Amino acid sequence: MADLLSSLKNLSNGSGVYQYFDKNRQLLYIGKAKNLKKRIKSYFSIHNNEITPNHRTSLRIQMMVKQIAFLETILVENEQDALILENSLIKQLKPKYNILLRDDKTYPYIYMDFSTDFPIPLITRKILKQLGVKYFGPFTSGAKDILDSLYELLPLVQKKNCIKDKKACMFYQIERCKAPCENKITKEEYLKIAKECLEMIENKDKLIKELQLKMDRLSSNLRFEEALIYRDRISKIQKIAPFTCMDLAKLYDLDIFAFYGKNNRAVLVKMFMRGGKIISSAFEKIHSLNGFDADEAMKQAIINHYQSHLPLMPEQILLNACSNETLKELQEFIYHKHSKKITLNIPKKGDKLALIEIAMKNAQEIFSQEKTSNEEEILEEVRSLLNLECVPYRVEIFDTSHHANSQCVGGMVVYENSAFQKNSYRRYHLKGSNEYAQMSELLTRRALDFAKEPPPNLWVIDGGRVQLNIALETLKSSGSFVEVIAISKEKRDSKAYRSKGGAKDIIHTMSDTFKLLPSDKRLQWVQKLRDESHRYAINFHRSTKIKNMKQIALLKEKGIGEASVKKLLDYFGSFEAIEKASEQEKNAVLKKRN
């Protein structure tokens, strides 16, 4: 406590970010302040050099303050810089008492560029510099389904570069394009098609009606497989915005955020209204053992969503909960980022209050649907058994694969919300000379990416205590808090045999080893994760090996033998790099002379 007391007596009055640590130097919390001295001292009461929590703070904060042993600060130029740095560090370091919202992606927009002679609908996530561009969105899902439908229903120019070819392609032959490249349609006639396209984007019901007619025609002609494609597409487009029955007389452009939470679970709902209609919506489920602060959750949600330059900005942002201080901070952040003054408002009456109530109703409904399942019970049992600080709601699992230290690869699979999240899987080509070096490289590369993709609650490593220690060292170097376990086969004659049916799995933690019965559901849960990572890494290794064998065969055809191929691979690192290298560079590696 002497270190903490000394730090509290020497605080700066400047803007910056503060970090609280416990006695083991584990990061507890990251915050930002316009005046660091004033903000940090608001957490504590100091009497006769004794530090206690400020009783005016919440019970959650008081519980955290009791654990604080050290604090560190980072000074920045102004409060805006502090806000951005705080958000970045929370994502990267995942402190115990901060709320981490993972949904920080930029949603896609559909746009049409009417400055061109023959405009077509395309997808973008950024602002385009051309004049005459009309945007629609954001779409939290279904943008590609809408786009595919438009191209199939209307005789639009099918590709961006079609006009330059000056020759009609197969789309003209199958009556999917009017071939403006050969002047078979005038600009004025094509503009009518483009305007019909606009109507379908703006009026989802009209688009769905046309798709249903197409589906019915296909079914009548016994083309059932094609009809099923349209059925699935209609279903996806219908789910884009479940609130489209809301149609206000006033043509509001609004973004709506509602937060609802109890105990260790919460839901954040986002709704996007354009021209008085809800066009899309999304939600995020959040879990935390240490409770929630609605103000903090809302702040992170707003920063995540508006940190990128967006094609369409709302007139107002509606929230269901936020302190006046945070509202002011966020308004300044958005103005600083987008050079546009947008009001953040907590409505008290009228249409806008009705919108917030709809968002809240949906948040509560989503919250109530997520009842305690067998999976959640197992997660809690796993946490208790392995003495984890957090329930492992999001898990990343790692495995490597190689053959005689060649074609070395690694795989990361992700498990969240009771399912494997295949869109988050990652594959890595590795250079390590042995399995330990390969695992170290794999984990280091993942840790270096924490700023872009925040760390999970838990890492599961396919390996023993050596691999576990490699993971712990990697995380220590990164400064991020992630709990780690490893799972391996028991050793026989000092060797681990994965293929031996009788060999039992052992779970390793930092301080303990667990040998559970094969029927134990906690072991089976960890095994399920390990098996998926092993399958993913093995499959990637096999595909890499096949690809490399083809590349070796091609090089042999060029008169390069296997020994020379090995030299080239050792030097250039990959077959792709060998292909790009000049003959002079290859000869230099092989020490050939002209």
From Swiss-Prot:
CDD domains: GIY-YIG_UvrC_Cho. GO terms for molecular function: DNA binding; excinuclease ABC activity. It holds the Pfam family GIY-YIG. One of its GO terms (cellular component) is excinuclease repair complex. Residues 13-99 form the GIY-YIG domain. SMART domains: GIYc. GO terms for biological process: nucleotide-excision repair; SOS response. The keyword Plastid does not apply. It is found in: Cytoplasm. Residues 205-240 form the UVR domain. Its main location: cytoplasm. Keywords: Cytoplasm, DNA damage, DNA excision, DNA repair, Excision nuclease, SOS response. Belongs to the UvrC family. Interacts with UvrB in an incision complex. The UvrABC repair system catalyzes the recognition and processing of DNA lesions. UvrC both incises the 5' and 3' sides of the lesion. The N-terminal half is responsible for the 3' incision and the C-terminal half is responsible for the 5' incision. This is UvrABC system protein C. It comes from Helicobacter acinonychis (strain Sheeba).
